[in-house]
Amino acid sequence: MAKSLLFGEQARRSMEAGVDKLADTVRVTLGPKGRNVVLDKKFGSPLITNDGVTIAREIELEDPYENMGAQLVKEVATKTNDVAGDGTTTATLLAQAIIREGLKNVTAGANPIQIRTGIRKAVEKAVEEIKVISKPVNGKEDIARVAAISAASEEVGKLIADAMERVGNDGVITVEESKSMGTDLEVVEGMQFDRGYVSAYMVTDTEKMEAVLDDVYILITDKKISNIQEILPILEQIVQQGKKLLIISEDIEGEALSTLVLNKLRGTFTCVGVKAPGFGDRRKEMLQDIAILTGGEVISEELGRDLKDVTIDMLGTADSVKVTKENTTIVNGKGDKVAIKERVSQIRVQIEDTTSEFDKEKLQERLAKLAGGVAVIRVGAATETELKEEKLRIEDALAATKAAVEEGIVPGGGTAYIDIIPKIADLTSDIIDVKLGIDIIRKALEEPVRQIANNAGAEGSVIIEKVKASEAGVGYDALNDKYVDMLKTGIVDPTKVTRSALQNAASIASTFLTTEAAVADIPEKENTPPMAPGMGMDGMY
């Protein structure tokens, strides 16, 4: 395919036009008085959102050079979202500001490579200073503030703080759509996996269609059980003790299933069978997790263990087990606490080592089931459009909260960036163009406050000067149009989000400035086939 080429200033300006189109679409969403953007969907209703990365992902421009610029800034938003989960609008805004200021200097004859050196130097200093002013998150109140600022809702803030308090830092919090109007929180205590009973005849409560077993033995195996003779010796031992049994296996079928159901219906013996969770190697690991949590052993031929030889001390135990049609929950497994801690440490190491996002997510779930718990925030709304928008807000708030717990918090509303400007201004260089790079970052750091003020109907430049003249930590509360101590008022941003937004914006923008040529495909013209004779409708009356 033939290529189209642009060079120098023309290439950079064409790409800058694309950067501006994307950034100008995203920037209107920043701050407590930021607006929403409507995204057209080919199927279903349009999506209304203020989530920077969701908007950026939808933007494709017709002009190939403009589209290149837009895609570069889209990467800023995506990378920030991947690392910190929030701050995508801020990152986009910073990238636009660095590119705009940088191109002015490059056009005036400055060396882009030296400018990039200055930008990197300034960003390193900025990140250091952000860490200096960072404060650790202390308790539920701080968590609620971070979430409330991100979601623009105090109710959501309290909900997320409750969820994090109940499942701990190792717990998993998921956001799902609710069928009702309200937004509520459900916490699953103990270990839950998505496998239900193999036969409805095993239920102990026919109204709720669930089986609840108290003080229960748990047989864990990766084998398929079809012959009752295989498990008869262990069943006899359990019956003698008058206990109940949960069997977790690949499957229970045939004679074994019918015998267990018959004994349950006669009231001789209560047993519930469920299929093992997961598939392949993940199944083996999950069975091992259950065994460690309950103090049992996995009965597997790979480990040289046969069902006929199972003894009581090979079984796991738990205070209670609840089995529904779709889920099994084991509460208060009686496993050895030291063994559980070792297993948790092992999973943490695997999480750090894995490069796959999918594997990381699954390992995190396993960790939560062993160490913390699982909380589900169910989001409800009157319409599907509102529900999608609310769900995106809560997902952002959740990511921001996790980031805050990791690295702490800084004054919000762009105040942290303003507070570190004097430290950036102190940086010097004998090379003029490197100094220009430092100045570019100094100016770009003002941009978030300016945009938050503009979106609130105030004059951005005036607000910036007032914040600069105030004490460190005092910023502009755009919601109430006043100047306050941001940390005391609860207007905070996660340190990780603030840091990542600047680092990712500077990385892409400084590379953009060094562009000297751009290459794009020339779209092929579609050849229209010649019209068949008579198709021109000549001679029609």
UniProtKB/Swiss-Prot annotation:
InterPro entries: Chaperonin_Cpn60_CS (IPR018370), Cpn60/GroEL (IPR001844), Cpn60/GroEL/TCP-1 (IPR002423), GroEL-like_apical_dom_sf (IPR027409), GROEL-like_equatorial_sf (IPR027413), TCP-1-like_intermed_sf (IPR027410). It holds the Pfam family Cpn60_TCP1. ATP binds at residues 29-32, 86-90, 413, 477-479, 493. It is an enzyme of class 5 (isomerase). Its EC number is 5.6.1.7. GO terms for biological process: protein refolding. It catalyses: ATP + H2O + a folded polypeptide = ADP + phosphate + an unfolded polypeptide. Keywords: ATP-binding, Chaperone, Cytoplasm, Isomerase, Nucleotide-binding. GO terms for molecular function: ATP binding; ATP-dependent protein folding chaperone; isomerase activity; unfolded protein binding. It is found in: Cytoplasm. GO terms for cellular component: cytoplasm. Belongs to the chaperonin (HSP60) family. NCBIfam families: GroEL (TIGR02348), PRK00013.1 (NF000592), PRK12849.1 (NF009487), PRK12850.1 (NF009488), PRK12851.1 (NF009489). Together with its co-chaperonin GroES, plays an essential role in assisting protein folding. The GroEL-GroES system forms a nano-cage that allows encapsulation of the non-native substrate proteins and provides a physical environment optimized to promote and accelerate protein folding. Forms a cylinder of 14 subunits composed of two heptameric rings stacked back-to-back. Interacts with the co-chaperonin GroES. This is Chaperonin GroEL. It comes from Clostridium botulinum (strain Loch Maree / Type A3). The lineage of its organism: Bacteria, Bacillati, Bacillota, Clostridia, Eubacteriales.
